Structure formats: structure tokens, C-alpha cells
Amino acid sequence: MGEKEIVDGCVAACHIAYACSEVAFTYPITPSSTISEVADSWMSRGRRNIFDQVVSVVEMQSEMGSAGALHGSLSVGCSTTTFTASQGLLLMIPNMYKIAGELWPCVFHVTARAIATSSLSIFGDHNDIMAARQTGWAFLGAMTVQEVMDLALVSHVSTFECSVPFVNFFDGFRTSHELQKIDMISYETIKKIFPYEKLKEFRERALNPTHPTLRGTATSSDVYFQLAEARNKYYESTPDIVQSVMDRLAKLIGRSYHLFDYYGHPDAEFLIVVMGSGGLTIEEMIDYLMEKSNEKVGMIKVRLFRPWSIDAFVKKIPKTTKRITVLERCKESGSLGEPLCLDVSTSIMRSELSSNNILVLGGRYGLASKEFTPGMALAVWENMISENPINNFSVGIDDDVTFKSLFVRQPRLDLLTSETKQCLFWGLGSDGTVSANKNAIKIIGESTDLQVQGYFAYDAKKAGGATMSHLRFGPKPIKSAYLLQRCDYVAVHHPSYVHKFDVLENIKQGGCFVLNCPWSTLEELNHELPSKIKHQIASRDVKFYVIDAQRIAQESNLGRRINNILMVVFFSLTNIIPLDLAIKLVKEAIKKTYGKKGDAVVNSNWKAVDLTLESLIQISYDKSQWISKDKCGEKSLPATAVETGNKDQEITKSTVLKQKPEHDVNQFVKDILGPVNALKGDELPVSMFEPTGTVPLGTTAYEKRGIAMSIPIVDMNKCTQCNYCSIVCPHAAIRPFLLDEAEFKNAPETMHIPKAKGGQEFSSYYYRIQVTPLDCTGCELCVHACPDDALHMEGLQKMEAVEKTHWDYLIGLPNKAEKFDRTTVKGSQFQQPLLEFSAACEGCGETPYVKLLTQLFGERMVIANATGCSSIWGASYPSVPYTKNQKGYGPAWGNSLFEDNAEYGLGMVVGYRQRRDRFRELVSNEILKDITEEEEFLKDDNASVQGRNEIITKYDHLKDYLRSWLKNIRNGEACQSLFEEISKLLEDNLINSNNFAQVLKKDRIELLEKLYDSRDLIPKISHWIVGGDGWAYDIGYAGLDHVLSFGEDVNIIILDTEVYSNTGGQASKSTPFGAIAKFAQSGNLRQKKDIGSIAMEYGSVYVASVALGANYSQTIKSLLEAEKYPGTSLIVAYSTCIEHGYTKYNLQQESVKLAVESGYWPLYRYNPELVRTEVVDNLTTIVSSGFTLDSKKVKVDIENFLKRENRFLQLIRSNPELASMAKDKLKAHSDKRFQKMKDMSENVTVTALKDQIKKLKDQLISIQNASKTGELAASGLINADLFIEQEMHVLYGTETGNSEEVAQYIQSQLVSRGYSSSSLNLDDLDIDEFLNPDKFSTVIIVTSTSGQGEFPGSSGILYEALLKKHLENQDDKFCSFMRFGIFGLGDSNYVFFNEAAKKWDKLLLDCGAVRIGAVGMGDDQSEEKYETELIEWLPDYLQLINAPEPKHDEKSEIPKATTFKVTILDSCRNDILNESTGTLCEKLDENNNIGNSHYKPIIPPNSVLLPVIENKRITNQDYDKDVRHIVFKLIGDGGDTPSLSYCLGDSLALYGQNPVNEAIKAIEMFGYNPYSLLRLSINEENEANNTNKVNQRYSSLFGYDITVLQLFVECLDLWGKPNRKFFQEFYRYCSNPEEKIQAKKWAQNEGKKLIEEFSSKTGTYLDVFKMFESARPTLAQLLDIVPFIKSRSYSIASCNKFVNGEKIELCVGIVDWKLESGEIRYGQCTGFLNRLPILDSESKIDSIPRLPSNIKASAFNLPFDYRSPVIMACMGTGIAPFRAFVQNKKYIRDVLKEEIGPVILYFGCRYYDNDYLYREELENYVKEGVITSLNIAFSRDPKGYKTSNCENIRYAQKMYVQHLMLENSQEIYENMIEKCGYFYLCGTKQVPIDIRKAIIQIIIKHSSTTEQVTSEEDANSILNSIQIMGRYNVEAWS
């Protein structure tokens, strides 16, 4: 007998395989991976085999590779083995035929596993074995862990003795992963039986040139057959040889085996034949039946399945046998029976038993490790003895479709005695429970004489799923190969499980129950525990204990690892071994398990062990009270079909396969998801399942696992709305939400929802970041990604209720994604993630990429997903995280295999393209074929059809859509939009009505029906092939390489975790040098495959390397470019993984950044479309390589990255010398690669050529500039000292990529002017490099601002270094050599507007640098965002540095290709001015009818038409300022529903119109007919177009017919002020050469003066065209250079509640001025308002004006407390919002009956008599006590002109508001500072500056001495803090 050890089946097999082999070729596949890992571990530790040699364990790229390499190794005489399962075995079949054909001795160790069919399963059955049974290999099967070892040795010996290769197989998981105490076979014993002589013979057959032979010939039909038959004798002799080996082994080890072993009654009448672990359960059942009633039942265990020995089998059958049942763990569809059953039947038929009339029955059990319990075994026997037994039955399921399943009478039959203790542990995936229980088994088994068994069940979730550890201990051998039926001890390690699972279902009477939870008192437990649990505890006299293991783990610095704590609890309560000894052994196990992770981890675990017992609490419960608890009020699982359905339904109906299965998600959740997640899936009947395995999307949203201990909680006061938390969230569990006014008002009161920040598109929304508490995993990534510390973690139980209420409300709101640019970091996160709540590990690095893909392209994605982590978290039945959007669109997902995913995805692309090509032919050749006469497609009797013209128009629109589709067939966004339009049009007129059928001929209708049926081919599918590095670098690489070479339009993303994550962390060819992984446990000593460089070699593949955690914008940019690229694209995505072993897992983003900054993971993009070449002297040189290195500098030493991850630290601890060498090699490799990429990025291959050209240019430019500088200096325009060198670099700091884009644009402008320029990330420079005067004497800095005045992620390091140097050398102006310009990107809604740019400016000036020009202040609140300022700032800067003019060529002289296409139609429409309304209308014909095309006003996106019911002047008629009070009626389509809702401080954005008569003149000037109809569309001929960038204002016109007059009146801003960008393009349109020369001057540096002079005269776009008569662009060209009319926003002067939501009131000043010519001109919008009729309540007109309008949200923050003081200051029409504020206060006081605080108003006017607006109303509010203090400053009235009789009303003359505030400073200070009031200001741009100065003076004056506010700086700091809190609010206008 050998030594006893506790091992699982994998280790048992490995022990023999390692001993008897010289080489093992491996590839990881579950569940065989453990064998490979153990062998690799032994190899790394130097363990030797029986040949006294360390086995060479070689990991291959696939199972195909392993089999091929193994075949080669055998061919040269090397004893070789491998380990595999399932698909892996199938991949080896071709080589298995070859090996068997050549009679090579060999053993495959196979952990038998299910084969993927309609779904994948990693669990055990015999389908893979049966699929390979025909290959000519011998198959030897084991039932127990002991048998695995013994029969493995039989296999290895037999294969040499009979020259037939063997498969040694055993059940996957049930045997492979079951822990048992077994007798090990020593190497000495193995050597005694090993056939060394046969080994010698084998080696003599090896291929060797000293005795050469040849194998593997190609044969013809004349000899092939004979060769096949020549091997017969080997197979005929094999059974006897195997039996001989078994007999010899028995003498050595004392355990006897036979080809077939019998067990049972010697005179059995009923016999069961079985193979594998199921036989153990049959044994228990036989013992039970024989003991109970001496039943004559027996069993034959099949050992040698192939070659099958009839004689050996028949000899084991008792002569008394009447019936035989063959149990099979496989299914062979379409066969008469499964393979074993056929073998048994054939054996009986061919033997002497054929005349005995033995009935042979076949049945299936245990597929994919389905449980096979004693109760099921009993059901098999009961079926066999029944009068009418079922043949081809199934057992263990409920087959209510074909009704072949057996009824299990005793499902909980437990055949174990009380001697065997059974313990069940419910753990949370990755919490360490399983590993702790493995240690516990080993401790018990090694320190006692008890037999042990351990089996561990998991769900398919990567982490956070349920784990069930089934442990048995007893004095006798444990045969029970099934889960626990009755438990002595139950431990539940996560408190949520008591609500989810029936955890005490199997607990015995008097059992022990341990619950890990934060509830420690009986009161808490009474409240928290479900009634059912309490009833079970009391009714079974359960001893109940609780412990808060999470608290202990946190105190011990263990995070969430509670395993060892609860193991100590187990030992303390079970008394299996003395407690002191147990704790000692536990600590030793901890040292052994965690030693590689360092002493700190070990010590933390030891501390937790020591704290455990004092924290264990036994609960004394009131048994009578608890036992009376019933299940009332409990959440129960929904009834399943087996409980409610009818089993007598006709089979034919249930077996019909639908072509397009429709899934009711709710029904699926009810019938399948709920029961499966409650671990009741075994009870589901067959009828519940869709035959093809198709499942509905979005089922994870129903799970609500609640596994996080703590969740992120947002402080919206700190949140800067960057959305970073959302983009990093692996589970889409935290998201940004936008709410409109109505949604905001209906939101839960507990939810803080501030105004949305950003550009104008956000202006009408509120914003909230929200977590879904029950879907969050608590990884904390969002907390660490937040730049503003706006997130912190709180306990789930504390926050669940309120946060769930918030989430439920927000998730039910309409998604507003369509209104935002999904191509930005922020905008992408407003898109619904179509991957949510997956079962990936907490902090998973893969899911954020796929989630982001779904946000960018999800509604049109098709995904081919390789097997691996991404297929498991992405599609583990029935949990599907992929979901659909509100329109029902979402990713379509498929999985084939591990190895063929690239080919699978390619097939999708080719197949879809083929179908789409046919569809395109249908559209172009049939539906749109040229038809000149309407009669050819119209019915003869169509004239009388009502609405005929309208129907024909719709049909014409359909054809227009289809034409547009043909032109945009490769444009994803356009096709998606057209798909929706076409589908709707067809549904409205073909499917849901007979409109088209009334008018169109039958053949047309049939074509349209075909079109509708195939409409899903309209979208341009975004094809994505998704997989991990194991697939891409190894097993699937050949296929991947083929797809890369193929050139199809398909996108590939490799989620590169650098190990085989799914199978447990084995090394792949992606594993980095020096990392420790399984199969590389001594450190991986080969460099990682550079798959990106390999792909780039094709020259036709788009390639990008990305790391989301390091650079969000680069990742998004890469994904967008890849998807747009018209060919194959490859994204290599750095994906963090728990296998990396982060020292602090929640800080993994920092590790990602270090990976990039150290050069370990470079970020780059290669776009073949950007490759440019030039031919110089017949030599083709690369001008642009198409390669962009986005991580432009190595910033930190690679060691900083390596030391954060345990995969590298393990090597440092175990072998410091090797680790040091590995680090040096990895660094050298990374540096070399970085330099190569830098060279590629800079095109150094043509450096010499460029240098020569540059020198010549420089000489010429220097001559030119010397002249120009002199001229400019002489003229005084520029100081000669400021002349700039011809090298100028643009440095940027960016967070989202916008600053980088601006920098690149500026760089391109510099390059076009002859400068040598580059754009560099600020932090890519170190300080010494930055202070190099030879390179950076002139720079432009472009930077955004992050958070509350912080630097963006890529610019803080250099700034801090420069600041430090300055502080150390304040008198040293070390930057005096530098000239700089600076441009900031910011949002004026933020307090620290452009703060980063201001800080850079101040620091550089302090260091002696000289700024050129002003600081550019880009503002997201401007109409064109930062571009508004940029197009003014950059030309000014270029003029100041005397930059040369851009180089001009022929292309620069002609107009560019237009963005739009304008089609002038043949028909016209007579639009005219409606004198009553001042707007356009359609003229009726002589019969008062309108034509076919109706006039409809153009309504900009997100706008509505509001009727004007009042427009009256409220200033004196003789006063020069015309101020209007304008009222809009809020009546929607419903008659009395407001069509717009607004709140305090909001503005109404109005779209003005141009004067009709002037527009007609302008149209005629451009040569068009004002009344011609036109149609606007994208110009498909302009390939540079990107429809994603097309403004909604333009795209909203697509598909509509408008007149040229309507375009000029309602769209083109021809009467607006031209910007600099216009002049830069305008000269191209001048056909007269002289005019072109003159116009070009306006585009050059000197043009600024011309433009300023022109603007001073308020020139318009139209004026420019009048000046240059030859410039007559087409309408399409006009659309490119003349913008659309912009909205003008006016503060709303009414309170919505005060006016009952019935109207909007404005106070608008009409803007007008007189030109030198005497012409009166008006502001664009106010001029339009001025042209409207004067209206009041008495006005009587036929129709009223309706104006396009929308709401723009206010930046004002309103107080939550009505009693907070409110101080308001305004000038002129700035009174508007404050009038609304005062109305609101009156409403609160008079209607809501709430107390209000002080209301103080400071109002600046010119004259009391002329412009004291709303005087009577305001002073009445004072008298009513609403306004506390009214203060009016009249700047033009003489002093003393008017006085007030009311003490609360103050008049002051000859002063401005700020002066009046200073006079009343005490009032201001008391209410604003002391009482924490809110201050509001509304006025022109200069006013906020003056007011702020006044308040600062007030703070200084009234602050107490203890506050030490003695300077403006201190006071300003106080005011800044008030502003950050939202209590200082400014709205200013120019």
C-alpha cells in the first residue's frame, strides 16, 4: 500500500502521467487544465519521472497543435502524453487516426466533458469520448479518484505492451475535481510494472537517420484497404494484454480490476451496465435494495470500452439475468440507441445468451454533470422491473415533450449512515470559500484516519456567483458521487443567500447553521431573516450561529476575503479535530497557500484567524415563536410550466421549430431564470426550453444579485459631470441620467439632481449619477476613476432602499441619447449600454470595452464571440447581459467554438454581404428601375382614391429613401436612420393600412412586400469578432491571420488579459516576459507575441492598441476609426484581470496608466488610409506612414509597473536574480519597441530627404521673413524682438481628446505655413526637455480644465515640476527664452472657467516667458463651443508672430467638395409673407386650394412652435430704447397640455427669420427662383464626409421639400455677422481673378484689419457677396460657408407655477442701429420680433404668429430652503429672470403657505420715467411684503429726481448698482454671508466684474478680525467657495 494523500482526479492522473512520460504537450481546457497546471508546477520545481528526468511540459497554441506536436514527439521515440476534454479532444481526432494508424504507444488523459451544441457546457458527460470512439484508440474508464490513478498506470503500461494508443478517461468535475483520500502508487511500484523492453522497442521504431524509415505515404485504392486491416491483430490482443496488466498491478497494490467488474446479487435478474462515476451511485442503490429486501439486482462496471471484448463482458452477466438497463452519460441523436447500449445489445446477440430473451433497455443520465442521485438510481431499477418499462428513457429531468423521463419517487433518498458527516458551505464566487474548504479537507484527511470527500459546485458567473462546497467525512470509504442530500452542518457566507436560495432545505434535525452577516442580535435577526428560514431552524432544532466575517476581514486588511475566518468557525463547531491543532494547521495552510503573495498577506490572514472565535455568537431563539412562522409575505418563485402546464399536449405542436423564435423575456424570467438562479433548474421540464438554445436578451437585469458589500454613493455637489465613473464600470451599474423639467419635478425627493453642465445641448436638462445597488459588485473602480472625489463607498444594506428607489425611477425614464454626440467620452455614456450586469468578476477589465462598443454601435452590431471569459460572462444560460434599446435593437451575439471564432465571424460577414448584395439588386434593378410614366406603376382606377396625391408623395419619399440608401450603403449611421424611416413608412402604408395597395399595381405591391420582409438588410451591420488572447494569440491564430489577410469589412477586438483567464490563468503567447502564470510557474522567459505589428505587416489592416483606463478618448477614437475603416480592423485592448494579482485590486486603473506610461503597453493607431507616398528621383518614399503613436513618451521606469502586480512580484520573491534579469530584458524589449514605434510615427525612413527639403525652405523663408519683420517693426505692428523662429510646437493637456484635436488643428495650420511643428502631450515632456531653448523657444499650449479647476490627466506632472523649480528659484527667470501662446477649453458654467489655462499662463509669465496675444478662452456655452473663440484667436496669434501665409496650390484656389447635395425640383410653390403674422405662408390658387407640396415651417430639432399672444412696447414711445413685453401661449396638441415646461431662471431660445422681401432680392442676386422647390441630402461623392458630424439642423431637413425662399428666410444667416472662418474660404468662390486676389487678402494675416473695419460697419454675409460680384456660390456651397440662423436666448420673465403653466413671458430689448448711409439695421432676432404685429389682449387678427422655440436651462442654482435669503442684482432687461423669481416667492407664500426668507433686489436703470421696467408691479410686491428690499439705481437721472415714500424702496441717482450695493453693504453681508444667502446677477459682460469687486469690498469691510479677511485674495477665496456651493450665480450677455 502506498502513502495516503488527499488529491482530486486530476492530480491522481497527473501523478502517473508525469511518472511515465518524457514530454507533455498541453493546452488548457476545462476541466482538464488542472492536470496540465500540476505537471507544469512539478516541472518548475524539478520533479523527476521514473526515467530520472524532469518532464518537459510544453504549452501549445491549441489542442490541434498539442496533438500534432505529440504525434511528432512519438515519431522520434519519446514517451509523450497530453490532457484534454470536450472540444479539445475533437480537435485531436485527425491526429488520433494517424497515431493509431502508425501504432504509436501513447496515453491521452481525458476529463470527459459535454460537447458544445446549441449551447456550451464545461461539465462532465461522455459525449466527447463517444465522438472519438471510432479512431482506433483503446478507451479505459475510471469511476473514482483511486481508480483514476490505478487505471492511468494500466493505460501507460498497456499502451507499450500492445502498441495501441489509450485514452484514460474519467468524469469531468465529478471525478476530476472531487477530493478523496487515496493510496498513492509510488515510483518504485510504477518501475516494477513498467515495460522497459517495450519502451526500447518503441524507440527503435523512431524516425532517425541512423536507421531511416518513411511513414505517412499517400496510398491508392489498391492497397489502402489492406493496410487498414493489417492492424486487426493488435486490437484483438489488446483486451487480454490489458487484463494481464491489471492482474499484475493487483499483486503490487492490492486492488483488483477487470475489463468488466460485476457488483451485486450473485443471481441477479435485473442488471445495470454503466461506465463512469454513476456506477458508485448504482452501488449504493444495490446495497440498499439487497439489504432492504434482498432484491436480485446487479451491476457491470465497464472499464475497457474500446476495444470491446464480447467474451469478457458476457462472462460477467449472471445466467439468471432477465433484463438489462444500459445507462449512458451521452446522447447520440438519431441513433437506435447510445453507443454502449448498442455494444451490449450486440454482445448478447452474438453470444450464447441470445436465446435467453434478455430485454435490453437503454437510458440517459447525467448529461453535463446533471446530478445522478440514489433516488434516480432507484427509479432506473423500478422502470426495469415494471410491466411496461420505458426504453431510451432519460432520468433526472422532466421530459414533458416526448415523455421519456422516469418519475423519481424519492428525490431526497439518502443512503449514508450517520457516521458520515456532511457539511455544506454556501460561498460567494472569489470570496475564497472553495480554497478554504480544500484546505479543510486536507487538514482533516491528513491529521485523522477519516475518509474525506470534497466536491465543489459553481454557477457560471465569473465572480460573485454562488459556490456550494459539499464536504463528507467518515470512517468508511465514501462512494456517494452526488451532492449532499442531508447536511449536518450548513454555513452561508453571504447574507443575501437566505433570501435567494433554500439554504436549509437539506439540514438534518439538530444540525448546525452558521450565517455570516452583520446582524448580531436576536432583534435584528427577527427582522432580517425570512420566515421560512426561521421556521426551518426552529422546527429542526438547529443550532444557530452568526459571525460578521466582513468586519473581521476589514480589520485584518483582507478586503473581502473571509474564507479562513469561516474555516476556523467550522473547526470550532464540528470538533472533528482538536481546535488548537486545527488553528495551527489552518495557519500552516495559509502560509503554504499565500506565501507567494508576501508576508503581509500571510500575517493579515493569521490576524483574522486569531480574531474569529471571539466574534462568533450563538443565537438563542424562541423556538415556539420561530416555528410558528409561515411563508406569508415571502417572495416565492413563480410557478413553472411543470406546475401549471398540461402534459397531455400534442407532441407535434411542441416540437415544431419556429423560424424566428419570439421570446417573452418576462415569461423566460418567470419560467427559467428565476428557478435556475434559485438552484431549482433541475426541476424544470423539457418543454420549458427552446430547441435551438436561443435565449432572449437582457435577462441579467432581472437577477438583482445584491452581492456587493458596499456600493458607490455620489455627492452631486462635487460631481463635475465628466461621466468617467460610467465608462470604467465593468457592469454598467453606475450611469449618468438626464431629466427634463417634468421628470425632475416627479423625481423622489431624496434624490439630489442639479442642472446639467456642458454645451447648449445640455441646457434644458438636469443631471444625476446613479448606481443600481443590487447590480453593483462593489469593485470601487468608479470611486478611483472620479477626478473630483464625488463618489464614496457605503454599506449596501444601509443604502439599498433609497438607492434602489432612485435607480428604479431613473431607469424608467426615456433615454435621451440621440441628442448627444456618442463619439465623445461624455456623450458615449449617455448612450444606453447594451451590455449590463454581467457575471464578470468585480473590476473586470474586459467588459468595459464591450460595453463601450455597444454604446457606440450596439443597435447594429453582430458579435462573433470566441469561447472564453467573454463568452462566459456574456452568455451563461440563462443569464444574458446583452440587451436591447427602447426601439428593440441590440447586439446579435453568437458563439461557435474556441478555435474557430475568426472563421465564424468571417462567415457572418460574407453571408450577410451576399444577402445584402441581392437585396441591393432588388432595390436598384426592380424597385427603382427607370419608369418614365406614372401609369406604369399606378392602378388604372387610382384617380378617385381619397388622398391620392399624398399617397403618391409618400411613395416618392420611399424611393428617395431607397436612393439615399444606395448612395450611403456603407455608412452605418445613415443606413440605420434610413432603416427606421423606410420601416415606418412601409408599416404605415403597406402593412398597417392599404394606402399603397389603393394606388399601386400588384407587381409594385409584391416588390414592396419583398422589401419589407428583407428590411433587416438595410442597416450596415457593424461586425465584431470578440475574443481573448488565448484565442487570438494561440488556438485561433491561424484563423485570425486568415481573416486579417482577407480584407473583409470586419472588426476584431482582442481582450488581452495576457493569460488564459477563463481556465484559471495559464500562460499564453500574450503573457509578458518575466510574469508567473500557470504553465510558466518559474517565470515566462519568452517575449510576448506582438500581434499588432504582425497585423500591420499586411499594410491593409487597421490596427490600434488601446488601454481604456489610461486614455478614454484614444480608446473611443480607435474604436470609431476601426469601425469606419472599409476593411479589416484589429483592436488590441489591454484588459486587466484578477489573475494579474494587483496589490490593491480597486486601484487597477493606476496600474493600467503605469503600463502605458512605462512603455509596457504602448498606445497607437495604424490607419492604412493615411499612408502617403511620394516619388522623388524615381524612388518611392513614405511621406506619411499612417502610424500614430498616442503614448509619445516613456514617463516612468517599468519597475514601477511591475511591482504593483503579483504575477511579477512572485518571481521577485522566489528568484530575485532571475526577476532582475527578466525586468532588464522586458525593459530593453519595451524600449526597443517604443523607439521603433516612435520612428514609425515620425517617418524616419525619409528623414534625410525631409531635412534637405527643410533646409532649402528654411533658407528661403528666413530671407522672406527678414524683410517682413523689418517692415512690420517699422510700422509698429510688431516688435522686432518678438520675431518667431521657424520651429514651433503645440503642447496639449487633454482628458477627453478635445484639446488634442485643437492642438493637431493648430499644428496643421503651422505646417501649412512652412513651420516645423509637432503636437505633443505636455506630460510627454520632462522639465529639462521643456526648458530646452533650441527646441521650445516658441510654443503654443492648449489645455482643457478638469473638475473644479484641476489639470486634465495629461498635463499636471510637467506643471508641478515647473512650479517646484519656480518656487525654489523665484528670482530666476529661467523661461525668459520662451515665447508662448495659450488657448483654453472650458465651460463658463463652471466656477473655475479655463482655470488650467490661466494657471499655465501665470506660471510661465512668472518664470519669465513672454505671452504673445491674449489667452484664448474657448467656451462650451458658445454657439460653436470652443471653435467660436478658436477661429478668432488663432488668426490673431498667427498675425502677431508674423506667420507666412499658407502654401497655395491649385486645390486651394477652388471651392471644396460640398457637404450637402441640393436638388432643385421641377415644381414650385408660391410662398408669401403673411402680413398678419410676419411669417411665411403658402399662397392659395384661384380656387383657394393648395398644391401638392404644402408649406410647413422649418422647426429646428428639439423645438416647438409657440403662438405669440402679446407683443407690446413697455418703454415710452419717444424713448430711444424699445423694450417689449412678449407673451407666448403654452398650448400643446392636446388643447390644454403645455408643450413646453420651464423653471426659474430658464431662457427661451427663439429662432428669428430674415425679412422676406430682402430674401427675395438676395435669391435673385444668386440666380435662383425664390419659389423653386429643393431637396437637401448628403453629398455622397464627398468621401471625406462623416455624417456623424452633420449638424442636426441640417439633417432634420433631409427628405423634405422646401422652397429656396424658405431656405433663405428661415435657415441661412445671410444677414448675420461673418466669422473669420468664412473669410478663409470665401475667396475660393470669386471667379474674377482680381476679386479673388482682393478677397484672399481677407483670409491672410492682413485680413484682420480689413475684417475689423468691415465689422465696425456691421457688415453681413450678404454685404460681402455684394462687394464681390463674381462670388456666386451654389446653394450647396452656401450651406457650407454660411451658417444657419442661430437661436437667441432671452431670460423668461414669468414663473411657471405663478402663471399656472399657461404662458411664457419675455422682456426683450429691440436692438437697432444706424449706418453711415442712414440705413437702420436690427439684430437678427429682435428685428424679426420688431416685424411682428403689435399685439395685446384687445388685438383682433385672423391668425397669430407661431415661432420656433425651445427652452435653455439656467445656470442658476436655486436654494432648497424657501427661507434662504435671496439677493438679486440686474440692469435693464436683466430684470426678466428676477421678476420670475419674485413671482415664485409670492406663489410659495400665498399658494403653498410656506414661510419665505428675505428677497432683496438691486435694479439698475437709466431713467425713472423711461425704463424703470415693471415699476408698479415691483413696488406692489414690496407693499405686499414679498420683496423685502427694493433698490433702484438711476444712472442718468439727476440726484434727487425722485424719492420713495416707502422705507423698503430706495431710489438713487447718478450711480450704478454696484455703488448702491456698497452703500447698503451691511444688508448684503448679513444676508449673503452671515445667513448663507444666495446671490444672483444678470447683466452685460462688464457688470459681473464690477459687482464682484463690490462684494469683495463688502466682505473685507464687514468680516470680523478673527476671520482674518484682510486682503482681496482672502475675500476672493471666500467668494469662490460660495460660488462652488452654488450660492453665487451669474448670467451675463454681450
UniProtKB/Swiss-Prot annotation:
Q: Which UniProt keywords apply?
A: 4Fe-4S, Electron transport, FAD, Flavoprotein, FMN, Iron, Iron-sulfur, Metal-binding, NADP, Oxidoreductase, Repeat, Thiamine pyrophosphate, Transport
What Gene3D superfamilies does the record point to?
3.30.70.20, 3.40.50.360, 3.40.50.920, 3.40.50.970, NADPH-cytochrome p450 Reductase, Chain A, domain 3, Nucleotide-binding domain of ferredoxin-NADP reductase (FNR) module, Pyruvate-ferredoxin oxidoreductase, PFOR, domain III, Pyruvate-flavodoxin oxidoreductase, EKR domain
Residues that, per the record, bind [4Fe-4S] cluster 2: C776, C779, C782, C786
Among its keywords, does the record have Transport?
A: yes
Question: Enzyme class, one word?
Answer: oxidoreductase
Which residues belong to the signal peptide in this entry?
none
Q: Which residues bind [4Fe-4S] cluster 1?
A: C719, C722, C725, C729
EC numbers: 1.2.1.51
Superkingdom, according to UniProt? Eukaryota
Which residues does the UniProt record annotate as the domain FAD-binding FR-type?
1501-1759
Q: Which cofactor does it need?
A: FAD; FMN; thiamine diphosphate
The answer to whether the entry has keyword Chloroplast is no
The molecular function terms of the Gene Ontology recorded here are: 4 iron, 4 sulfur cluster binding; FMN binding; iron ion binding; oxidoreductase activity; pyruvate dehydrogenase (NADP+) activity; thiamine pyrophosphate binding
Spell out the InterPro entries in the cross-references: 4Fe4S_Fe-S-bd, 4Fe4S_Fe_S_CS, CysJ-like_FAD-binding, FAD-bd_FR_type, Flavdoxin-like, Flavodoxin/NO_synth, Flavoprot_Pyr_Nucl_cyt_Rdtase, Flavoprotein-like_sf
Q: Which residues form the 4Fe-4S ferredoxin-type domain?
A: 710-739, 767-796
Primary role: May have an important role in respiratory metabolism. Cryptosporidium have a relic mitochondrion with no function in energy metabolism so it is not known if PFOR has a function.
Subunit field text: Homodimer.
Q: Which family does it belong to?
A: In the N-terminal section; belongs to the pyruvate:ferredoxin/flavodoxin oxidoreductase family.
Name of the featured protein: Pyruvate dehydrogenase [NADP(+)]
Q: Which organism is it from?
A: Cryptosporidium parvum
